[in-house]
Curated annotation (Swiss-Prot):
One Gene Ontology CC term in the entry: extracellular region
Keywords assigned by UniProt, alphabetized: Autocatalytic cleavage, Calcium, Collagen degradation, Disulfide bond, Extracellular matrix, Glycoprotein, Hydrolase, Metal-binding, Metalloprotease, Protease, Repeat, Secreted, Signal, Zinc, Zymogen
Spans of repeat Hemopexin: 278-321, 322-368, 371-419, 420-463
Protein name: Interstitial collagenase B
Catalytic activity: Cleavage of the triple helix of collagen at about three-quarters of the length of the molecule from the N-terminus, at 775-Gly-|-Ile-776 in the alpha1(I) chain. Cleaves synthetic substrates and alpha-macroglobulins at bonds where P1' is a hydrophobic residue
Activity regulation annotation text: Can be activated without removal of the activation peptide.
Region of interest (Metalloprotease), ranges: 95-273
Organism classification: Eukaryota, Metazoa, Chordata, Craniata, Vertebrata
Residue sites binding Zn(2+) 1 per the record: 165, 167, 180, 193
Protein's GO biological process: collagen catabolic process; proteolysis
Domain comment (free text): The conserved cysteine present in the cysteine-switch motif binds the catalytic zinc ion, thus inhibiting the enzyme. The dissociation of the cysteine from the zinc ion upon the activation-peptide release activates the enzyme.
Cofactor comment text: Binds 4 Ca(2+) ions per subunit.
Annotated positions binding Ca(2+) 4: 282, 375, 424
Length: 463
């Protein structure tokens, strides 16, 4: 059976009130009729003016009211009309379309995805991050794993289109139809299409790309709509700028298809309390404007537009990395991360360890044989020079020439006055290096070459 397209639409109701059907008033009955035709399988050949048509319409209204948790009257009463006016997903809510035939699901647990193109309203990094977070919504609670691929089409292809784009479901630039997806299967199966003309955002305005993608991927994995208004898969589109948590109803339904995660996340672990004043970290990095703190098997993300940090599991994002890193840093300008443990280095792009890694730090960077681990590392944005801190010394590496600068190692305290202790971690933000020692951070101004502030690490978490 071919995949049924799952259209995500907004149905804008008229600004004036709809008449009650039983009153026989016809002024706006076509709008109600169209809504029920789109989402409740109301027969296109039915006529609202016929007695049978009125009865069928009333029955469809009762179905809609029951799903939305409204008073079941069969009338287009004000509460029902308000629900109809809300932005919503265009996937039909009743059989035969919403109850997918034989519960289509993927027959494998490792799925790939590819991003074909981008919206002009967000940077590539923000788009990629939103999509990756949307996939993690589902991988966190199932055995499913998702990996982005670049050289070929993934099992799930995400793309932005304008107008007629070849799947019979034309975008028109209006807010009534801004994305659609397809059920699991071959060909278009699982794919997600976005309207290129819409304003996609990472906040509460217009359409939040993360939230829409997470909802659409629920359909791509085989889910229909939920009658739990707090669920991600509830028909109405709502988003608030807060730390997203998947509803238990969504978890139960996706696990009915694929089973639970073999490594369930325990977010109550004491190590995950960001406001613990004594909390220390294995490694700290900047990445695409975020600050990421690694601790045991978890990491904490600080994102400027979110009021609270996000907590995730390292293995779910980077499954091929070792746990408990010694150090890590972002290579400026190339969208690459490097992680260190012992005398090994792993180079990573997206979720993938690059070919040939891990490598010995001696052969890759040119460290002497007596350097067997790295305490901290940071790549200076303006110069492309990476600073490696080991005990009381530091080395400087040129990322452009891929060689150590002559004259190193040097004493940390000599070139960074006031930093006279072991450096646990270091990052750069604007014109400052932030040096971390135990649970304290020191802000070192690169222009004045002085420490100008110190504070607890948990100030990053709005504690």
């Amino acid at each position: 059976m071919p995949s049924l397209p799952l259209l995500l639409r907004l149905w804008a109701a008229s600004s004036y009130s709809f008449p009650v059907i039983q009153d026989g008033l016809q002024k706006n009955v076509k709008t109600v009729w169209k809504y029920l035709e789109n989402y409740y399988n109301l027969g296109k050949n039915m006529q609202a003016k016929n007695v049978n048509g009125k009865e069928v319409m009333a029955e469809k209204l009762r179905q809609m009211q029951q799903l939305f948790g409204l008073k079941v009257t069969g009338n287009s009463d004000p509460e029902t009309l308000r629900a109809m006016k809300k932005p919503r997903c265009g996937v039909p809510d009743v059989a035969p379309y919403a109850i997918t035939h034989n519960n289509p699901r993927w027959t494998k647990t490792h799925l790939t995805y590819s991003i074909l193109n981008y919206t002009p309203y967000l940077s590539k990094a923000v788009v990629e991050d939103a999509i990756a977070r949307a996939f993690r919504v589902w991988s966190d609670v199932t055995p499913l794993t998702f990996q982005r691929v670049f050289e070929e089409e993934g099992d799930i292809v995400l793309s932005f289109h304008r107008g007629d784009h070849g799947d019979l479901y034309t975008f028109d630039g209006s807010k009534y139809h801004f994305a659609h997806a397809f059920l699991p299967g071959l060909g278009l199966g699982g794919n997600v299409h976005y309207d290129l003309d819409q304003k996609w955002t990472d906040n509460n305005e217009d359409f939040n790309l993360f939230y829409v993608t997470a909802h659409e991927l629920g359909h791509s994995l085989g889910l229909s709509h939920s009658n739990d208004e707090e669920a991600l898969m509830f028909p109405s589109y709502t988003w608030s700028n807060k730390d997203f948590v998947l509803n238990q109803d969504d978890i139960n339904r996706i696990q009915a298809l694929y089973g639970p995660s073999p490594n369930p996340i325990q977010l109550t672990d004491a190590t995950l309390d960001p406001c613990n004043s004594g909390l220390t970290f294995d490694a700290i990095i900047t990445y695409r404007g975020e600050v990421i703190f690694f601790k045991d098997r978890f990491y904490i993300r600080v994102i400027s537009f979110l009021p609270e940090p996000l907590i995730d599991v390292i293995d779910l994002t980077w499954p091929n990395l070792p746990g408990k890193f010694d150090a890590a840093y972002e290579v400026s300008g190339v969208d690459e991360l490097r992680f260190f443990k012992g005398s090994k280095v792993w180079a990573v792009q997206e979720q993938n360890v690059l070919e040939g890694f891990p490598m010995d730090i001696q052969s890759f960077f040119g460290f002497p044989s007596n350097v067997t681990n790295i305490d901290a590392a940071v790549c200076e944005e303006e110069t492309g020079k990476t600073y490696f801190f080991v005990d009381h010394m530091y080395w400087r590496y040129d990322e452009n020439t891929r060689s150590m600068d002559p004259g190193y190692p040097r004493l940390i305290a000599e070139d960074f006055p006031g930093i006279d202790y072991k450096v646990d971690d270091v990052i750069q933000k604007e014109d400052n290096f932030y040096f971390f020692h135990q649970s304290i951070q020191y802000r070192f101004n690169l222009k004045t070459r002085r420490i100008d502030d110190s504070s607890d690490i948990n100030t990053w978490f709005n504690c």
